[in-house]
Amino acid sequence: MREIVHLQTGQCGNQIGAAFWQTISGEHGLDGDGQYNGTSDLQLERMNVYFNHASGDKYVPRAVLVDLEPGTMDAVRSGPFGKLFRPDNFVFGQSGAGNNWAKGHYTEGAELVDQVLDVVRREAEGCDCLQGFQITHSLGGGTGAGMGTLLISKIREEFPDRMMATFSVVPSPKVSDTVVEPYNATLSVHQLVEHSDETFCIDNEALYDICMRTLKLSQPSYGDLNHLVSAVMSGVTTSLRFPGQLNSDLRKLAVNMVPFPRLHFFMVGFAPLTSRGGSSYRQVSVPELTQQMFDPKNMMAASDFRNGRYLTCSALFRGKISMKEVEDQMRNIQNKNQSYFVEWIPNNVQTALCSVPPRGLKMSSTFVGNSTSIQELFKRVGDQFAAMFRRKAFLHWYTGEGMDEMEFTEAESNMNDLVSEYQQYQEASVSEGEEEYLAEDIVDEEV
């Protein structure tokens, strides 16, 4: 059955990954030791997408945990779900990447990468029909960004026809952890544009805003942020893990969401938002879910979709919901907000429905949108990159690891191209599109 192999790299990736495994173990009725004590057959039916059934009736995640320093791994291992993972699947170095993309991609990370690929290969061989890979990492650091993108391109080489989805935490405008974030992020985006099939962009600042504005948490911890991310990851992967009336898998999602191969950076949202450990205080209805889901305040990336247009989007509903009601609501949203959807892709909203709600909720919805406003995010990083690169600030850390300045220039222009592509399709109209098609036809004939 369509398995997915999960990789988590770097500190951020491992913390988000741990939260994700905790969430879906709960949904499938597994305890911290991987023993099943659930209540419904639905939990078992497609357990094998993410879990391997081992001896002693234990379920083991198909997860590979990677880091260049042992700290985060130890934290995962000693956490409540530490015994869940297969001990051989922890692959770590000792030196750390020190927030340096070049260390993760070229020196330290490159030494460890073969060891990781062996584990990935072993996991892939244990699958009946591997659907693809998902990777959690941040783009601002050294290991998640540098080594994460190295792994993506290596896995791409070895499994060219499998899907590659990434959950990438992008640097946020106000909350910055390191000065060299713009460098690391630009170099990573340069890789993701080429090697990933779908990238779900998550942004710490947007998560902080949700925690403070919507959930009224005065001092959100990373635990609270990771809880939100794991809710989205669980939502995006629901239809792979549970039966439903309208299912989608990674490939179906990509086919419906990516109109042009380079434009595969998605904004994600989730409704209803609840804080960790808290439950919803009122009954939620489908209209409310759709309303909340399309609310800019619910987006987990700090770019406002009202400044751009949706090329495509997808809504995944969970719970006992009537299909008709969902379709009516989605049509309603499209009719009311026509200006936010490009008119040259008719019916560009895809819906999926799954009958099993997340724990503690009657129904929920996950939103994935391919909006041209994501360019704001790249623009912002690009401006910060340009400001530092103009003075060649901090560059010696990268060139010292064997990188060349050309690589920075290439990465910068690739990201600028991405921004202008998004802008071009934002402004495109139906008639223009027709002219372009005609022009292409004429060129073809001449050839």
From Swiss-Prot:
Top-level taxon: Eukaryota
TM segment ranges: none
Function: Tubulin is the major constituent of microtubules, a cylinder consisting of laterally associated linear protofilaments composed of alpha- and beta-tubulin heterodimers. Microtubules grow by the addition of GTP-tubulin dimers to the microtubule end, where a stabilizing cap forms. Below the cap, tubulin dimers are in GDP-bound state, owing to GTPase activity of alpha-tubulin.
CDD domains assigned to the protein according to its UniProt record, in alphabetical order: beta_tubulin
Subunit structure, interactors included: Dimer of alpha and beta chains. A typical microtubule is a hollow water-filled tube with an outer diameter of 25 nm and an inner diameter of 15 nM. Alpha-beta heterodimers associate head-to-tail to form protofilaments running lengthwise along the microtubule wall with the beta-tubulin subunit facing the microtubule plus end conferring a structural polarity. Microtubules usually have 13 protofilaments but different protofilament numbers can be found in some organisms and specialized cells.
A Pfam short name: Tubulin
Record gene name: TUB2
Protein name: Tubulin beta chain
Subcellular location: Cytoplasm, Cytoskeleton
Xref: InterPro entries: Beta-tubulin_BS (IPR013838), Beta_tubulin (IPR002453), Tub_FtsZ_C (IPR008280), Tubulin (IPR000217), Tubulin/FtsZ-like_C (IPR037103), Tubulin/FtsZ_2-layer-sand-dom (IPR018316), Tubulin/FtsZ_GTPase_sf (IPR036525), Tubulin_C (IPR023123)
UniProt source species: Penicillium digitatum
One cellular component term from this protein's GO annotations in UniProt: microtubule
Keyword Translocase listed: no
Residues the entry annotates as binding Mg(2+): E69
Tagged with keyword Magnesium: yes
Top-level taxonomy: Eukaryota, Fungi, Dikarya, Ascomycota, Pezizomycotina
Primary location: cytoplasm
